From Swiss-Prot:
It is found in: Cytoplasm. Keywords: Amino-acid biosynthesis, ATP-binding, Cytoplasm, Kinase, Nucleotide-binding, Proline biosynthesis, Transferase. The gene is proB. Its EC number is 2.7.2.11. Its main location: cytoplasm. This is Glutamate 5-kinase. It comes from Streptococcus suis (strain 05ZYH33).
Length: 358
């Protein structure tokens, strides 16, 4: 028996028929595999799209809506239908499921972030399968960008999962879009996610979903930097989920970073709300990135936005305007501005223990 934690993300295209509506056969196939893995001792979390697909026809629309308000309304109807489908299927195998709706705010707020972590840990300990979705009825931006890829990475990182599996309608990452370029080559393993990878990623997904390969790369970047390996594969095979656990099927495996961030630094890097920024000189960049030092107020050359003590701000290199990291500040923007204006900037702005390089 194993107690490994696996987070599966299933996209809309893996759950729907050609007309965009929910496919019960596909859902049954997924839940059957989840049940088999559950019985083997795996701790399973499912991050699922599909609430809009489940609800738009019940609401009277002939095809999947494109307007934000209509999507929100469809999601409000469909979320209950979607979770009911999962719940009934899992109950056939005696498995309890739990619905959790999240938004980015649940990760941006440190207390809610911890609460979400604790609730998920209890559910897994009690052998339930959490079924998680973006709260599409209120999360406007998430509906626009199909951010359940990112959500699944955040959940996997939060739980320190052993593997994140992103199921989609393609069998991994290619050097070009395989649907339009016959020379596209499949990439079975990725050690480091670079800008070149983002450049080659095909950005368009299927019309039923809202996320393409670019969002999956962004998700993989979050997870791998948090110490969680990621496997992207197709959901079309009947046993895709079962095979994905050991990467027996064709896909792309993203290896976990050797120097994974701890949970506190993960929160600063990926989730904390940042409404302000500072620009620092070359000496400060070198001290923070290469010498492990704190950011002194003397290194700050410009600031943007207002911040109070304890808030997380972005830090940019003045030379090339590159984002180099984020950190909690020990001075307010007002105090820092006053110091800079009087030519007497002093003390630590961001301590190295409250800093994460990006």
């Amino acid at each position: 028996m194993t107690e490994k934690t696996i987070v599966f993300k299933v996209g809309t295209s893996s759950l729907t028929q050609e007309n965009g509506s929910l496919d019960r056969i596909k859902i049954a196939r997924i839940t059957n595999q989840l049940a088999q893995l559950h019985q083997k001792g795996y701790q399973i979390v499912l991050v699922t799209s599909g609430s809009i697909a489940a609800g738009f026809r019940r609401l009277g629309f002939d095809k999947r809506p494109t307007k934000i308000a209509e999507k929100q309304a469809s999601a409000a109807v469909g979320q209950g239908l979607l979770i009911e489908e999962y719940t009934q299927n899992l109950m056939k195998d005696g498995i309890v499921s739990a619905q959790i709706l999240l938004t980015q705010d649940d990760f941006a707020d440190a207390r809610r972030y911890q609460n979400a972590s604790q609730a998920l840990q209890v559910l897994l300990k009690q052998r339930a399968i959490p079924i998680i979705n973006e709260n599409d009825t209120i999360a406007i931006e998430e509906i626009k960008v199909g951010d359940n890829d990112t959500l699944s990475a955040q959940v996997a990182s939060l739980l320190k999962a052993d593997l994140l599996v992103l199921l989609t309608d393609v069998d991994g990452l290619y050097t070009a879009n395989p649907n339009s370029d016959p020379t596209a080559q499949h990439l079975p393993q990725i050690k480091e996610i670079t800008e070149d990878l983002f450049a080659m990623a095909a950005g368009a997904g299927s019309s039923n979903g809202t996320g393409g390969m670019t969002t999956k790369l962004q998700a993989a970047q979050i997870a791998t930097k948090s110490g969680v390996p990621v496997f992207i594969c197709s959901s079309k095979e009947d046993t895709a989920l079962l095979q994905a656990v050991t990467q027996a099927n064709r896909g792309t495996l993203f290896l976990a970073d050797d120097h994974a961030m701890n949970q506190r630094k993960q929160w600063m890097a990926f989730y904390a709300r940042t409404d302000a920024a500072v620009e620092v000189d070359a000496g400060a960049v070198d001290a923070m990135l290469h010498q492990g030092r704190s950011l002194l107020a003397t290194g700050v050359k410009a600031l943007e936005g207002d911040f109070e003590v304890g808030q997380v701000v972005e830090v940019y290199s003045q030379a090339d305007h590159r984002l180099i990291g984020k950190g909690r500040v020990k001075l307010s923007s007002k105090d820092l501005q006053d110091q800079l204006a009087n030519g007497r900037a002093e003390g630590v702005l961001i301590h190295r223990n409250d800093w994460v390089s990006l």
